[in-house]
Amino acid sequence: MSTDELLTFDHVDIRFPIELNKQGSCSLNLTNKTDNYVAFKAQTTKPKMYCVKPSVGVVLPRSSCEVLVVMQALKEAPADRQCKDKLLFQCKVVEPGTMDKEVTSEMFSKEAGHRVEETIFKIIYVAPPQPQSPVQEGLEDGSSPSASVSDKGNASEVFVGPSVGIVDLIRMSDELLIIDPVDVQFPIELNKKVSCSLNLTNKTENYVAFKAKTTNAKKYYVRPNVGVVLPRSSCEVLVIMQALKEAPADMQCRDKLLFQCKVVEPETTAKDVTSEMFSKEAGHPAEETRLKVMYVTPPQPPSPVQEGTEEGSSPRASVSDNGNASEAFVDMLRSLLVPLFSNAASSTDDHGITLPQYQVFINFRGDELRNSFVGFLVKAMRLEKINVFTDEVELRGTNLNYLFRRIEESRVAVAIFSERYTESCWCLDELVKMKEQMEQGKLVVVPVFYRLNATACKRFMGAFGDNLRNLEWEYRSEPERIQKWKEALSSVFSNIGLTSDIRRYNLINKNMDHTSEFLYIVLILNFFSEISDMTGLTTSYQFLLMMKSNLISYDIYIYPTKFCVNVFIGV
């Protein structure tokens, strides 16, 4: 490869393992080692056989991007594994700030006199890797293991030798999706909804669609019940059981949960998934996994002893059937939050003027947010007598050090990510300061994704990513500053993310008496470990809090898994 190429590639050819009736894929890494914006376009000699995602794009200076080449499933093996197909990459220098959507075929036309660099790749068929056959301890090499799986995914019918565990057997199978755990366990608590989370992992190179259904649809529901798991990624599914009015006899349950999955076309989304895709009658074979539903005894937390009461006395607190937090639970939330937001100290600015201690710092971009979502949040906090800082309090034109002081004086920061957020270097500089305070244990940061797909945002896709790349180009002479921005974004994105819809908040805004309950839910998320300690909940116990009312037309589910809290907001 010559050193003056606009783009360099990590492969010199495209290799596909031949597996009949399965799509194959190969990823290419495109690296731009120049100081120019470089646009590219990919095309193949057989477009019906191969597709490239993305087929056009722009690689920023001194950066790289990944391209996935997908081959359609073969119905029969090619003779001698020979392939004459090729993949062509064309690339050229474009104007700074050019976006992916602005790349057109005309830009690469030689007839129009455009200088274009070309790279041609051969497509090669190779034999698929052969996994090693597992040999159980105590068996002769090559002998048949006594274990068998009669019902895929049914752990109770698998005999496992001493050296091969259930998880190992599942991992070594050729299933499209690996589901963890291997059964659905619900702790039995009368008059309470309970939930169980499942992790679906796709270790193939294909897009895999799934559909979930139960043998008792009135008793259980699954969120999401359909979806698409991208290649080499995973997703989480929540199974919820309706409240039981009486304990089942002998804790026995015959219900099952069925997952159907199949390979679909690249770029298929969840909204494209239909029941017909899994219909056997229509000739669409799907892989099926059945999970048993099991009832288990809930863990018994230690009995809390209130001051001034006898040990073992019955607690007064209870959770009402509608799922709202009980009076005792709300009191507990207040006991955690009040120390954070009471007894506010004051500070003095550079001109000797006494200012209130700002306890919540709101980091956002754009007047459209100030007049809608941010306005709601500020009102909700002020109703709770919490001091809030937004830039409407400060004089415009103040330097960043002044804003940094406001962050240092705050206990909680709310970072509201919108499409326009990454237009502002000030927002990102504030975020860097928030990250520093967070790492020192002085600040709790709550990220909110405002009308954004959280996953796309974390991958810097769409307008959010385009704006960031434009800002990187504008400040390309300050690489250390850019690196701090990216580190701050990644750090904050690893926290909980709430997905916001302004229409819902407008409804709440008309009835501000309901906002304090919602506010407590938002702020308490990052203190959940403290609640667990107070209530005796363990990390293996799934705690479900449902908030429902006529005003709020969606449920908020909160449950910790390995010290993480996941929030699902949906109609």
From Swiss-Prot:
<feature type="compositionally biased region" description="Polar residues">
    <location>
        <begin position="143"/>
        <end position="153"/>
    </location>
</feature>
<dbReference type="GO" id="GO:0007165">
    <property type="term" value="P:signal transduction"/>
</dbReference>
<feature type="domain" description="TIR">
    <location>
        <begin position="356"/>
        <end position="493"/>
    </location>
</feature>
<feature type="region of interest" description="Disordered">
    <location>
        <begin position="132"/>
        <end position="154"/>
    </location>
</feature>
<feature type="region of interest" description="Disordered">
    <location>
        <begin position="297"/>
        <end position="322"/>
    </location>
</feature>
<keyword id="KW-0677">Repeat</keyword>
<keyword id="KW-0520">NAD</keyword>
<dbReference type="Pfam" id="PF01582">
    <property type="entry name" value="TIR"/>
</dbReference>
<dbReference type="InterPro" id="IPR000157">
    <property type="entry name" value="TIR_dom"/>
</dbReference>
<dbReference type="Pfam" id="PF00635">
    <property type="entry name" value="Motile_Sperm"/>
</dbReference>
<dbReference type="InterPro" id="IPR008962">
    <property type="entry name" value="PapD-like_sf"/>
</dbReference>
<protein>
    <recommendedName>
        <fullName>Vesicle-associated protein 1-4</fullName>
        <ecNumber>3.2.2.6</ecNumber>
    </recommendedName>
</protein>
<dbReference type="InterPro" id="IPR013783">
    <property type="entry name" value="Ig-like_fold"/>
</dbReference>
<feature type="domain" description="MSP 2">
    <location>
        <begin position="176"/>
        <end position="296"/>
    </location>
</feature>
<dbReference type="InterPro" id="IPR016763">
    <property type="entry name" value="VAP"/>
</dbReference>
<dbReference type="InterPro" id="IPR035897">
    <property type="entry name" value="Toll_tir_struct_dom_sf"/>
</dbReference>
<dbReference type="InterPro" id="IPR000535">
    <property type="entry name" value="MSP_dom"/>
</dbReference>
<feature type="active site">
    <location>
        <position position="430"/>
    </location>
</feature>
<dbReference type="GO" id="GO:0061809">
    <property type="term" value="F:NAD+ nucleosidase activity, cyclic ADP-ribose generating"/>
</dbReference>
<comment type="similarity">
    <text>Belongs to the VAMP-associated protein (VAP) (TC 9.B.17) family.</text>
</comment>
<feature type="compositionally biased region" description="Polar residues">
    <location>
        <begin position="311"/>
        <end position="322"/>
    </location>
</feature>
<keyword id="KW-0378">Hydrolase</keyword>
<comment type="function">
    <text>May play a role in vesicle trafficking.</text>
</comment>
<feature type="domain" description="MSP 1">
    <location>
        <begin position="1"/>
        <end position="126"/>
    </location>
</feature>
<dbReference type="GO" id="GO:0005789">
    <property type="term" value="C:endoplasmic reticulum membrane"/>
</dbReference>
